[in-house]
């Protein structure tokens, strides 16, 4: 007879701690924060993936702050507006006026990769590039917050009352591109973002192999199910770390022309097929392969593809059915009846598979309908895709249970598109928040908008539910504009250009970089020196002799207004 096993107390304690943590996670998930979130895994799965050392992250506090900010905007029909920040200077200036910060993958790719090798937005930079930029900015935010506290606590109450308080700790939302590979790559990327300070992350539904900037051509989508896997992987990692990082699901389905696979039935309605029966057995890929075997290349191969596509009569299956019904030898009333029946059975919310759609078509009298989605596949094996707002809506329906915001990338600032997308997604997910890219890739002056329309665009689409809106590359463009115009003027007019265009404008607009030593924290670190040395230091950076004393006063030059002429005064003092 086998001896009974006596469970050691250590094992019981271990299981007790595990079960307690499982209950805590479940209670967390049941909170208002996650009432719209669907998870295909359990709290036990999450706790099993955690270590025994509990950790906390500053980014989690920022994530909670971001969530509150966005939900407040959603309730008020307003929007958090921001733009891509390049560096600590920009992020501290933005803090005075905006309530969130964006970190753009495009800007990082062009200006700040971890290999220092710049390039276009193809997500081919090392995957720690954007997390490192987040850390760069998050450290700066925390530093300027500490610096401000030291400065304010050195003031009297009256001085503090007169001095505006700046909340430097504005939540950062970062560009996660496509997740940078498979599930484990996405998990590790999201871990980095949390550790480096991101309050939110967006992930898009393009193929990671062929990823393009949202406003480039040649975009290839992944299946709906694959992108859901990315979102689930991100959420799982956030859960494992115990953080409430805001997750944004982006879709590029409006302008995409290709899709990796036809494995997901939710994509079937938008895949194109050849409808010309004369091409039966003559796939585009085979035609191109034959051309290459014959020694053709470049323009010759492009001509083969162009000619093939010109005669293929590419259509979605639904378009093919509707055209076939219109050409049937039946009465107009019967045509209308069959078209209505087709539309009722094949509406986008039903997400019919192609097999199901063919069965319905056959019931409508279309037994020998020719439509082949394999014939037009590219040399890489991609299927042709009919990008549209409706395709983005269908993806929004699928992504919403796994994300906090949905973002539809567009090719122009179009109110009609925005309205259709918002109403479409919210018809199934009325509480979901939406995001919008106020892209500098749009030629806004060519959009047909008046200046008034441009001014009102943000609040107008905010009322539709777009509660987070951002100019991805405004930091980049602002940096380029200021540098180019100043360099040109400086080359022509020397120091007068600097004084007129930079120094005086900093003073006139109250920009705190005018006193750049103070901005960089010289006073703050003097406090360290003096604290270590008993309250006095002969080597304090801001002691007697620092040139920044010149900026504590302004002088009025006759006829020039209160612009300051300390430059002349400095020269006079130097000659004394």
Swiss-Prot record:
Binding site for substrate: 104-106, 214-215, 250, 437-441, 472
Residues annotated for Mg(2+) binding in this entry: 175
Cofactors that this protein relies on: Mg(2+)
MF annotations from Gene Ontology: isocitrate lyase activity; metal ion binding
UniProt entry keywords in alphabetical sequence: Glyoxylate bypass, Glyoxysome, Lyase, Magnesium, Metal-binding, Peroxisome, Tricarboxylic acid cycle
Ribosomal protein keyword on record: no
Catalytic activity: D-threo-isocitrate = glyoxylate + succinate
Pfam families named in the record: ICL
InterPro entries: ICL/PEPM (IPR039556), Isocitrate_lyase (IPR006254), Isocitrate_lyase_ph_CS (IPR018523), Pyrv/PenolPyrv_kinase-like_dom (IPR015813), Pyrv_kinase-like_dom_sf (IPR040442)
Main location: other
Segments carrying motif Microbody targeting signal: 574-576
Gene Ontology CC terms, in alphabetical order: glyoxysome
Active site: 213 (proton acceptor)
Cross-referenced SUPFAM superfamilies: Phosphoenolpyruvate/pyruvate domain
E.C. number(s) listed in UniProt: 4.1.3.1
Pathway: Carbohydrate metabolism; glyoxylate cycle; (S)-malate from isocitrate: step 1/2
Class of enzymatic activity (EC top level): lyase
The organism's place on the tree of life at top rank: Eukaryota
Entry keyword annotation includes Electron transport: no
UniProt function note: Involved in storage lipid mobilization during the growth of higher plant seedling.
SUBUNIT field: Homotetramer.
Similarity comment: family membership: Belongs to the isocitrate lyase/PEP mutase superfamily. Isocitrate lyase family.
Protein name: Isocitrate lyase
Organism per entry: Gossypium hirsutum
